[in-house]
């Protein structure tokens, strides 16, 4: 009798918690990038952030949206993908603008310091998506090139999905590729840190938020009975996040000593 009397409170409370979890699922994924975005804007330096993180998330979330057409899953996960795509495009726009501005400033300083009046400013060649140069893939000079690449990938992947949507094997494979790609999210940052033997320029807050967010996301997948691919993705992401935090701890304890007479090129690209 008492349990029935509490239904008027427990049912709305359960609904409120469910809505809160869904909202956290939709918007929580973009929160880790807020401190990194602010750091880049404040310092006007994007060297510490690997733009390949954006590439991984764009591919993963586009594939996840296409997977939804073959196997419907919860709406919050679908909205999360759409918002994450917009967020990654904003990150790419900022990183591209900052990198190009820094390269231009470096050329201006070089020209001003030149002793010869006849010396000309050496303008770096513009790199474009339409050049189809694999050596400069994802290192283009204009944000519009990234947009063209994303649209081209979406169009091709969407057309293939349209032709194969009736194949259960294709749909499950598509879902697996989506979550496997997302599980590799931290790998570009992990590799960059290993290559430079430093986490300088990387936002520790961002990685901590990655870890907490991925742990929450994995628990959400398990509790909501999401497709198995999602849970596997979440567990792999947590492991990669912990590896990056381990790098930050190790490099802080044993910082790399700068080599004598080392030349530090301006505008070094992350990854």
Curated annotation (Swiss-Prot):
Phosphoserine modifications at: 110
PQ-loop domain span: 14-80, 178-233
GO cellular component annotations of the record: cytosol; endosome; membrane; trans-Golgi network
Membrane topology reported for the UniProt record: Multi-pass membrane protein
Pfam families on file: PQ-loop (PF04193)
Top-rank lineage group of the source organism: Eukaryota
Effect of residue 175 to A: In a colorectal cancer sample; somatic mutation
Protein name: Solute carrier family 66 member 2
Gene: SLC66A2
């Amino acid at each position: 009798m008492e349990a029935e009397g509490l239904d008027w409170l427990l049912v709305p409370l359960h609904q409120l918690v469910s809505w809160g979890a869904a909202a956290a699922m939709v918007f929580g994924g973009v929160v880790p990038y807020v401190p990194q975005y602010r750091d880049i804007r404040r310092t006007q330096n994007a060297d510490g952030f690997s733009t390949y993180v954006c590439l991984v998330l764009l591919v993963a979330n586009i594939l996840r949206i296409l997977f939804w057409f073959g196997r419907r899953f919860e709406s919050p996960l679908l909205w999360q993908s759409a918002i994450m795509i917009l967020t990654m495009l904003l990150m790419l726009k900022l990183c591209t603008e900052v990198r190009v501005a820094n390269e231009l400033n470096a050329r201006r300083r070089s020209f001003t310091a030149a002793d010869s009046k006849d010396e000309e400013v050496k303008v770096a060649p513009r790199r474009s998506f339409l050049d189809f140069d694999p050596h400069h893939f994802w290192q283009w000079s204009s944000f519009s090139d990234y947009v063209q690449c994303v649209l081209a990938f979406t169009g091709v992947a969407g057309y293939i999905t349209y032709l194969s949507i009736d194949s259960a094997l294709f749909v499950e494979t598509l879902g697996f590729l989506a979550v496997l790609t997302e599980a590799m999210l931290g790998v570009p940052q992990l590799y960059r840190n290993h290559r430079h033997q430093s986490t300088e320029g990387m936002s520790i807050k961002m990685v901590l938020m990655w870890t907490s967010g991925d742990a929450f996301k994995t628990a959400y997948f398990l509790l909501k009975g999401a497709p198995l691919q999602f849970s596997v993705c979440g567990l792999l992401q947590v492991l990669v996040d912990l590896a990056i935090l381990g790098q930050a701890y190790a490099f802080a304890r044993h910082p790399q000593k700068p080599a004598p007479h080392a030349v530090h090129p301006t505008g070094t690209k992350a990854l």
